[in-house]
């Protein structure tokens, strides 16, 4: 294998149009050549790539199969290799605003990411696959079910009055579809009609967290809170995932839970 190489373009701006208001916007374009991953994009691409490519024994994809003395396929080997290309483009933003409210101060912090494209070209024989808005291999690398939503939003509102701060946080992830559909488009094949037993689409999810923090004697900080206030369930992907039937790196798998935290300042 050869080393990966990347070209990165980032453009950002910080604007303060009003007192107490700050807006930050960043555009990124990351292009990785010779990205390291499963040969041919994994078995999901090696098998159809060999078959639809004419099953030529000289085809590198077909050479991944091992045959026994009778000519029957006995094994499939998909080693780690250099992929053709991975390119990701998107926009990050953050809006922070604070203003007085009664005898306290109200703060808003809105941030998010819009994934414009996440192109994965698993080998030079097929077109790049746009993994933005998809889950599962090859978009999920080697862990089936990893979701790549186009929209991620993180919003927080807090009100500080005296020694108390009340806050509400909102998290949002847009829906995603099975990467098999994007894979078939790249292979110029019709959309799959006999998809295995798993979800073909993961619905969008909203999560709300609430907390109250008290400053005590200028040395201690007591926080009472609840995460996943509405007890929103994680999106399940059936047999496409080995980690609790969902993507625990994105979705909340624990449900509603309460917590108490104490911090002490050392002098």
Label the predicted regions:
Residues 22, 31-33, 116-118, 169-188, ...:
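C-terminal beta-signal and adjacent terminal beta-strands/loops
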Residues 5, 15-19, 31, 87, ...:
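Outer-membrane beta-barrel strand-turn architecture
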Residues 77-82, 135-144, 186, 194-199, ...:
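Extracellular loop and loop/strand-boundary signature of outer-membrane beta-barrel proteins
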Residues 11-15, 93-97, 110, 155-159, ...:
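Residues on the lipid-exposed face of transmembrane beta-strands in outer-membrane beta-barrel proteins
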Residues 1-24, 76-91, 98-101, 146-150, ...:
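Outer-membrane beta-barrel signature, preferentially recognizing the C-terminal barrel domain
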Residues 28-180:
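Gram-negative outer-membrane beta-barrel transporters
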């Amino acid at each position: 294998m050869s080393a990966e190489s990347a070209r990165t373009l980032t453009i950002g701006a910080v604007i303060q149009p009003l007192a107490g208001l700050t807006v930050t916007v960043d555009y990124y374009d990351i292009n990785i050549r010779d990205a390291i991953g499963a040969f041919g994009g994994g078995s999901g691409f090696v098998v159809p790539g060999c078959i639809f490519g004419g099953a030529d024994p000289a085809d590198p994809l077909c050479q991944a199969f091992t045959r026994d003395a009778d000519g029957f396929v006995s094994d499939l080997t998909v080693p780690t290799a250099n992929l053709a290309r991975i390119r990701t483009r998107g926009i990050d933003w953050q809006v922070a605003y604070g203003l007085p409210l009664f005898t306290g101060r109200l703060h808003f912090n809105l941030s998010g990411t819009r994934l414009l494209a996440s192109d994965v070209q698993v080998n030079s024989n097929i077109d790049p696959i746009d993994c933005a808005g998809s889950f599962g291999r090859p978009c999920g690398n080697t862990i089936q079910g990893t979701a790549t939503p186009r929209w991620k939003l993180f919003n927080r509102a807090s009100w500080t009055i005296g020694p108390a701060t009340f806050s509400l946080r909102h998290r949002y992830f847009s829906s995603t579809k099975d990467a098999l559909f994007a894979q078939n488009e790249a292979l110029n094949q019709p959309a799959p009609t006999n998809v295995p037993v798993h979800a073909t689409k993961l619905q969008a999810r909203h999560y709300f967290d609430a907390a109250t923090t008290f400053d005590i004697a200028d040395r201690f900080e007591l926080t009472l809170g609840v995460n996943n206030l509405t007890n929103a369930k994680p999106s399940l992907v059936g047999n496409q995932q080995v980690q609790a039937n969902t993507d625990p790196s994105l979705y909340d798998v624990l449900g509603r839970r309460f917590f108490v935290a104490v911090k002490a300042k050392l002098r």
